[in-house]
A protein has these predicted regions:
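Charge-rich amphipathic alpha-helical interaction elements
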Residues: 1-216
Length: 216
C-alpha cells in the first residue's frame, strides 16, 4: 500500500473518490468474470477427461482390429482397400464467445449425405476385422473433433483466467488500497488546513476585538 503523489486538494479528493468507486466496481465485475470462467473451465476439464478416455479406448480397439486384419490379409490387399477413402470430411471453423474469450468450434461437413457410408472396398477379399477398425475410427471421429475443441477451449480459458486473476489482484492489493490511503491522507490534510484556517481566523477576530476595545 502506497500513497499516490498528488496534491492534497478537494478537487483531487473528488477525483480519487470517483476512481475508487470505479475500481471497486471493476474489481467486482472481474471477480464475477473470473468465477464464471472457472466454472466453465472446470466443466470443460471434466468433459475433456471423459472424452480422452473414450477416444483412447476407441483407438486401441481400432488398433486391435487392424492388427488382426493385417495378420490375415496380404499387405498389398490391405493397402489397396484403404487407398481411396469413401468418405471425405471438410472442417468448418467457427467461433463462440465465452466471457470475451473466442472459443473455436469445428463443424464437420461430409462429402456424402450418409455418414455411415464409410467402406470404400468390397468384402470379397477383406477381413471383417478391417470393417471393425474402420467402423471404430469412424464412430470415434466426432469425439476426436470435440476433444480438439475442448482442449483448445481449456487452453484459452486458462490463459484468460490467469489474466483476470492478475487484474483482480492488482485492483485488490495495489490500486484500491493506494486510493484509500491517499484519500485518507488528503482528508486528514484538508481537516488540518481547515482547523489551521479556523484558528487563524479566531486569532484575527481576537486581534480586531482587542483593537476595537483599545479605541474606546
Amino acid at each position: 500500500m502506497a500513497r499516490l503523489n498528488v496534491n492534497p486538494t478537494r478537487m483531487e479528493l473528488s477525483k480519487l473518490k470517483s476512481k475508487l468507486v470505479s475500481a471497486r466496481r471493476g474489481h467486482k465485475l472481474l471477480k464475477d468474470k473470473r468465477d464464471e470462467l472457472m466454472r466453465q473451465f472446470m466443466n470443460l476439464i471434466k468433459e475433456n477427461r471423459q472424452l480422452r478416455i473414450e477416444v483412447e479406448q476407441a483407438i486401441s480397439e481400432a488398433n486391435r482390429y487392424m492388427a488382426v486384419a493385417g495378420s490375415v490379409m496380404q499387405r498389398e490387399v490391405l493397402e489397396t482397400a484403404l487407398m481411396l477413402p469413401k468418405q471425405e470430411v471438410e472442417l468448418q471453423v467457427n467461433e463462440k464467445n465465452v466471457m470475451s474469450v473466442y472459443i473455436p468450434m469445428f463443424i464437420p461437413n461430409y462429402r456424402t449425405s450418409d455418414n455411415n457410408d464409410i467402406y470404400s472396398y468390397g468384402t470379397a477379399f477383406t477381413s471383417i476385422d478391417l470393417d471393425g477398425a474402420v467402423g471404430a475410427l469412424s464412430e470415434v471421429f466426432p469425439k476426436m473433433i470435440r476433444l480438439a475443441e475442448v482442449e483448445k477451449a481449456c487452453q484459452l480459458l486458462a490463459d484468460e483466467i490467469e489474466k483476470t486473476r492478475r487484474r483482480v489482484n492488482a485492483l485488490e492489493h495495489i490500486m484500491i488500497p493506494d486510493y484509500e490511503e491517499t484519500i485518507k491522507f488528503i482528508t486528514m490534510k484538508l481537516s488540518e488546513n481547515e482547523r489551521s484556517t479556523t484558528t487563524s481566523l479566531m486569532k484575527v477576530k481576537d486581534m480586531v476585538l482587542r483593537q476595537s476595545h483599545s479605541y474606546k
